[in-house]
Amino acid sequence: MSWLSKLMPSGIRTENTPAKKRSVPEGLWEKCSNCGSALYGPELEENLEVCPKCDHHMAIRARARLAALFDVDSPPTEIAAQLGPVDVLKFKDQKKYGERIKASQKSSGEYDALIAMRGMLKGNPLVAAAFDFAFMGGSMGSVVGERFARAAEVALEVGCPFVCFSASGGARMQEGLFSLMQMAKTSAALGRLREAGLPYISVLTHPTTGGVSASFAMLGDINIAEPHALIGFAGPRVIEQTVRETLPEGFQRSEFLLDHGAIDQICDRRDMRDRIAELTTMMMRQPHPQDADAA
């Protein structure tokens, strides 16, 4: 205590006296990973995790994405929600696969990386699936493949379009060949949809790589990407190390892919619901739907 503090009355706080720290609720403020702006959490969530300052598309959870797609007045039903991963191979790297599963389930709150639902989009039936990158990097294992296949089967039974939002690092190495088999399994499921004349729209988000990009993610009747999403089989650093050349600026980003004919269009996440509704009604030759939000 300084001599000045001794002379000051006890009721008076000096400038150097530490004030009580105010606890800020977790998630109240977030920082944009692109422009660095401080963003108010609830407003960012309402804006579908898109920065209002620079329009940068940040990561969004699968359930939030699907909730923004389906009609509010007709709650969707989840498909194959009870399925969970099994460590058939008893795989172990630095950590046991079984332990990784439990850790991911605890941190993400999901059983696996793909959520599939059946619901309504502006009054018309729709089946949609979305990857949750928070679960082991959105990697594709047996459960992801099975949920995708079952979602396609539901779309086939109902006779409605199928939409999938991809965000994945690729096949899950801890499941070995069981994971790689899902590439053929999901592609075959889409083949049955195509034979029935039902549309499949693939939405590629950041990032869509590996076995997912090499299978159902690029098999859409229409392939849509979110702005500046990384899309490709191997990442740019791996390619540069392999070919020993500097890649073009923006290589493997959605804008580059659109310019080179690899995808059909780019759509802002906030406009995605309307865009998908327009495309599905056109492809199904349905009358233009009434906007359920405006009703």
Swiss-Prot record:
Its main location: cytoplasm. It is an enzyme of class 2 (transferase). Residues 28-295 form the CoA carboxyltransferase N-terminal domain. This is Acetyl-coenzyme A carboxylase carboxyl transferase subunit beta. One of its GO terms (biological process) is fatty acid biosynthetic process. Pfam families: Carboxyl_trans (PF01039), Zn_ribbon_ACC (PF17848). It catalyses: N(6)-carboxybiotinyl-L-lysyl-[protein] + acetyl-CoA = N(6)-biotinyl-L-lysyl-[protein] + malonyl-CoA. GO terms for cellular component: acetate CoA-transferase complex. PROSITE patterns: COA_CT_NTER. Belongs to the AccD/PCCB family. Keywords: ATP-binding, Cytoplasm, Fatty acid biosynthesis, Fatty acid metabolism, Lipid biosynthesis, Lipid metabolism, Metal-binding, Nucleotide-binding, Transferase, Zinc, Zinc-finger. The lineage of its organism: Bacteria, Pseudomonadati, Pseudomonadota, Gammaproteobacteria, Lysobacterales. A zinc finger (C4-type) spans 32-54. The gene is accD. It comes from Xanthomonas campestris pv. campestris (strain B100). Binds 1 zinc ion per subunit.
